[in-house]
Design a protein with these regions (language model features):
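Alpha/beta-hydrolase active-site loop
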Residues: 121-142
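Cap/lid segment of the alpha/beta-hydrolase catalytic domain
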Residues: 105-127
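A domain-start/cap signature at the N-terminus of enzymes
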Residues: 2-4, 10-70, 82, 96, ...
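Alpha/beta-hydrolase fold nucleophile elbow
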Residues: 145-155
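C-terminal catalytic histidine-bearing segment of alpha/beta-hydrolase fold enzymes
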Residues: 223-224, 233-320
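Short substrate-entry loop that stabilizes the transition state in hydrolases
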Residues: 63-111, 185-186, 206
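Short beta-strand/loop motif that positions the catalytic acidic residue
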Residues: 198-200
């Protein structure tokens, strides 16, 4: 079966499961297997004949059978899922916001793992859209998830994949957050309106604001921030001026300007978090050690909290 057909089949299974749950009121379902709350589970899947894996975490709750929102976390290159989770504190955020957390591992070995986000034209690359759809189906066989509140968050290569998911699995996600990652190719004109938060440093040396630089390998391509924002503003119907907010804590060499187009009047909330003099880094309140030559890290905001707050207010209409 061609990749596109397999992907449509997996997405169709998601739709059938969603419809079945709507018949139960769309809110509750008994957990299919024994799953302990507050525990992280490692899961292995075979997708396209490849061994793939992810972990998922269910925060403690006094209503374990209730359907809950699902947050997909896509790690950057050189920082696999568990390492990245510890770095940005996603399990603590899942506890706070009540998200089921699922974090897939990219293809590769050791730390050298990445996702196929459309940056390289290689027919032998894995289909990570199919992997994502298969992973969601697998999670749905274990616990009750709220199909109207499936979110994706990623950094760098993982952030690029969140954009790709809006293209390859349209209508699946209720919102995305991409930090230091723009799409590998321009967004399609028929892309569905989707709440999006883009976070990018103006002096990012790895994925520059203006797109690939002379230091970017020739076989890698990705979009610049300005054109990506313009595309999302068109898709999401952002015609009014943005609401602006400045964040500036002294001592970190950066400032943050948050550009926000609320919905309504836009079709979907759209946010650009512009990190002035910021590098290829995840903003935090306390500086953290990271790879060299990645630029300044902003300590003006807690990006994990800001991203989860943005996602938690998004919900898509399910087709009945």
């Amino acid at each position: 079966m061609p990749k596109r057909n397999r992907r449509q089949w997996a997405a169709g299974c998601l739709g059938l499961a969603s419809s079945a749950w709507l018949g139960l009121g769309g809110s509750t379902r008994v957990m299919a297997r024994n799953v302990c709350l507050g525990v992280t589970f490692d899961v292995r899947l075979v997708v396209e004949g490849r061994n793939r894996s992810y972990f998922f975490y269910l925060p403690p709750t006094d209503q374990p059978a209730m359907a809950r929102p699902l947050l997909l976390g896509f790690h950057p290159y050189l920082q696999p899922n568990r390492m990245w989770e510890r770095y940005i504190g996603l399990k603590a955020a899942a506890d706070r916001y009540g998200f089921i957390l699922a974090m897939p591992k990219g293809e590769g070995w050791g730390m050298f793992r990445s996702f196929n986000a459309g940056l390289v034209n290689d027919p032998y690359d894995p289909d990570d859209l199919l992997f994502t759809a298969t992973m969601i189906n697998d999670i749905a066989s274990r616990v009750a998830i709220d199909r109207s509140r499936i979110y994706a968050m990623g950094m760098s290569n993982g952030g690029m994949l969140t954009h790709a998911l809006t293209q390859g699995l349209p209508g699946l996600l209720a919102g995305i957050v991409s930090v230091s990652g723009t799409p590998g190719t321009p967004l399609a004109g028929d892309t569905l309106a989707t709440p999006v938060m883009m976070v990018h440093g103006t002096t990012d040396p790895i994925t520059p604001w203006s797109g690939p630089s002379r230091l970017t390998p020739k076989f890698i391509h990705f979009q610049d921030v300005d054109s990506t924002l313009a595309q999302w503003r068109t898709i999401n119907g952002c015609t009014a001026d943005a609401d602006l907010r400045l964040y500036d804590r002294p001592g970190d060499k950066t400032q943050i300007i948050c550009h926000r187009w609320p919905a309504p009047p836009a079709l979907a909330e759209t946010v650009l978090v512009q990190v002035l003099k910021g590098g290829h880094r995840w903003p935090v309140l306390e500086k953290q050690r990271y790879f060299p030559r990645t630029g300044n890290q902003s300590t003006d905001v807690d990006m994990t909290a800001m991203a989860c707050e943005f996602l938690s207010r998004q919900q898509r209409q399910l087709q009945v």
